[in-house]
Amino acid sequence: MNKRVFSLPINPKLSEEFVINTFLPFLHEYRDYILDLYFTCRIPPFDQDAMGDCYSDNIALIESAIYISNQSDIPLSATFNNIWVRPDQKNLDLWIKEFAPIYNSGVRVVTLPHTTWVSSGQIQAAFPELFIKNTILREVTKPSEIVSLAEAGFNYINLDRDLMRDRDQLLRIRKAKDYCAYLGKPVMISMLVNETCWGGCPIMPEHYQYNSTRTKDDPIFYASPISRVSCSTWDVEHPEFDLKQANLPPWRDDWVEMQELGIDTFKLHGLSLIHI
């Protein structure tokens, strides 16, 4: 069984001292268990994403992530997960133009939100070594979606976190994954395991829409008036709060069981704006 099972985030707000003295030593020690490092990548038309933060120097963020990847010898994954960016030809052409320098810097893994773009084959033609992930925001839950995404050209599929407690559906998805391999379209399957959000959260899509359309003049979601009806208060109002979190328990047996159910990678959350 593959040991490289974790996809880890690079927090864009890490200080240089922390990166050098703490983060890189950690990555060196555990690199045999880490598949890749993903980071929020801000290039047109993706000026914002589901992480929801605003930065003054997007180029510096990219350069910092590339530095960490090079120093740790762990592949870098650029994340473009804003599903509210219009999926038209103009934006596809623009993204290919803007991503080219990053690809030429050695980045070979991306998360992309639009199946139409991947289906066009234009991205693969421009970047033949690119490994393409879908975004968890597309809420993939069905075996048929696995096959469709593999046929479209995705190499790696993030499942909806709610499947964590649906063993029967995971077994069906494992069969779909095997079928993709039979078709000559093998895919890796990933599960986000520690975001602490409720399974079936009724406002999660709206939270991510808020983040993905936020500007520097807007407060973060949890500082906005509308958050009064969000999970910012649920831990106090609902005694069952912890039991509803779609988190994988810390016990090793549970993680091994997920692998046996077809999960290749455990994604650890990288949301910049965590409610504290």
Annotate the PLM regions.
Residues 2-145, 154-274:
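Active-site pocket-lining/capping segments in soluble small-molecule metabolic enzymes
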